[in-house]
Amino acid sequence: MNNIERRKEILDILRKSSSPVPAKQLAARFDVSRQVIVQDLAVIRAST
């Protein structure tokens, strides 16, 4: 999965969730580090 696909999935997960989703949980889901998720979230925030 590339960065763009992962970010789209992260955004979808966050939109569907009724409560906050920990970065650690997303990192485990996508098999990346928590720091990668934090960077992805920064990109998502900057683009919205």
Q: Can you name each region flagged by the protein language model?
A:
Residues 1-48:
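Short, basic/aromatic recognition patches that contact phosphate-bearing ligands
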